[in-house]
From Swiss-Prot:
This is Exosome complex component RRP41. Pfam families: RNase_PH, RNase_PH_C. Belongs to the RNase PH family. The modification N-acetylalanine is found at A2. Transmembrane segments: none annotated. It comes from Homo sapiens.
């Protein structure tokens, strides 16, 4: 990584993007007929799959049931071939548990859980290929899967990462940019209200720079929303045609 120029004098990144430019996003909904909701997304070379079941009765001990809202259960996993490491991660390892917790916190802020008291909503996300922005891809795939399941949400929840290189805020970091070790943040946003569902930083950043990086992530999340909204509308149109409406 030594000597790698992350941002050229002309303002181009390693992969040819401008500072605030997203990687190419492709997504599909309804990829698994057996699930209540499902979606697949590619953000650059990062690929994630999300499956949703519920709302359904609480599984296991009924003491876990919440009298005023649904219990949101999120589980994260990554395929053993998803990174260059080829390292087998045990199910329930620390990274997977942390990601599952982050996803749960994110979707508890977005799903209208009070409409389904004493029930459970399961969100399973698997990363098939990791090349930067893993959390964001998981959130965006899960949002589409929750919508596919017909579960009411306050708003879309859209996520993107951002970093700071050579005095410039970069949106939607690739693996190369993440591996360089500069300050990075991950943001999950409810775009209509501007409410932040989750914000995480992994390094210190001066207050003057933080606002710029946060705005880069927020604008990127709004751009993601535009793309996801298009995917949802296309899915609804295709479903209507199949149903003969």
């Amino acid at each position: 990584m030594a000597g790698l120029e992350l941002l050229s004098d002309q303002g181009y990144r390693v992969d040819g993007r401008r500072a605030g430019e997203l990687r190419k996003i492709q997504a599909r909904m309804g990829v698994f007929a057996q699930a209540d909701g499902s979606a697949y997304i590619e953000q650059g070379n990062t690929k994630a799959l999300a499956v949703v079941y519920g709302p359904h009765e609480i599984r296991g001990s009924r003491a876990r049931a919440l009298p005023d809202r649904a219990l949101v259960n999120c589980q994260y996993s990554s395929a053993t071939f998803s990174t260059g490491e080829r390292k087998r991660r045990p199910h329930g390892d620390r990274k997977s548990c942390e990601m599952g917790l982050q996803l749960r916190q994110t979707f508890e802020a977005a799903i209208l859980t009070q409409l389904h008291p004493r029930s459970q909503i399961d969100i399973y996300v698997q990363v098939l290929q990791a090349d930067g922005g893993t959390y964001a891809a998981c959130v965006n795939a899960a949002t589409l899967a929750v919508l596919d399941a017909g579960i009411p949400m306050r708003d879309f929840v859209c996520a993107c990462s951002a970093g700071f290189v050579d005095g410039t805020a970069l949106a939607d970091l690739s693996h190369v940019e993440e591996a360089a070790g500069g300050p990075q943040l991950a943001l999950a946003l409810l775009p209509a209200s501007g409410q932040i569902a989750l914000l995480e930083m992994d390094a210190r950043l001066h207050e003057d720079h933080l606002e710029r990086v946060l705005e880069a992530a927020a604008q990127a999340a709004r751009d993601v929303h535009t793309l996801l909204d298009r995917v949802v509308r296309q899915h609804v149109r295709e479903a209507s045609i199949l149903l003969g409406d």
